[in-house]
Amino acid sequence: MAISVITPIYNEPCENLERFCALLAAQKGEFEVIFADASEPNFYEGKNFDLALNLSKIFSPERFKILPCKKGRGTQLDAGASVAKFEKLLFLHADSAFCDEGAILAAERALDCCEAGYFRLKFDEGGVLLNLIALCSNLRVKFRNIAFGDQGIFIRKSLFNAVGGFENLAIMEDYKLSMKLKRSGVKFCQLGQNIVTSARKFRREGIIKTLIKMQILQYKFRNGASADEIAKSY
């Protein structure tokens, strides 16, 4: 069996993409990679970086796709899922990383037994507050069954399509998907592997300030605020 890895990108820094390609090259198992690319025209021109060339050094042509699409993470992820060859899907952000070379393979195998799952979140920087936020994120999925995109959501394609995918949302597309799965009675399973995500937003805007802001926006979304309204405050 195999799995389709779907990654949305929009003007992603070249160094992030180079690191991400190296991460993919180190992963075990059979998988294809789909980049749902909404980057501005000519964004990478003159930057001495060619995503297709980098991928061609790692994968045979049938194992990767660069899919031009409209901006909007939900739209991009849905577009990637629509062209995925395999029944198993893993949605992975370009600023995420794995410490375990068998992480993608573990997600693929987990979908033999469960319908959807996620990895344990860890930040790329230490500190008591960031470690506590990561712990609370993992406990949130365990007890409330709400997973976010930076936790590496994986799911069977048939189930993903049955609940309507991510939908065309400017933000909170992962939250909406989790709520739909929760209403359908689907329980996320947690893998033992960590997924490492960037703490740059917390560092840039302040850890406490960012945490409070996110909780307020999630509360508003749960209580009927539109994704467009939330995006203006994000």
Residue locations for each model-derived region?
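Short active-site alpha-helical segment characteristic of glycosyltransferases
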Residues: E173-K180
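A conserved acidic beta->alpha catalytic loop
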Residues: C14, D37-L51, S96-A97
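Conserved donor NDP-sugar-binding/catalytic core segment of glycosyltransferases
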Residues: E101-L129
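Glycine-rich, basic loop-to-helix element that forms the pyrophosphate-binding segment
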Residues: P68-A84
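Short beta-strand/loop segment that forms part of the nucleotide-sugar
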Residues: F20-C21, E30-P41, K65-C69
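Short aromatic/hydrophobic "clamp" motif used to bind/position activated sugar donors
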Residues: L89
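Short, well-formed alpha-helical segments that are part of the catalytic scaffolds
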Residues: E12-A26
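A conserved hydrophobic helix/loop-capping motif in glycosyltransferases and polysaccharide synthases
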Residues: I3-E12, Q27
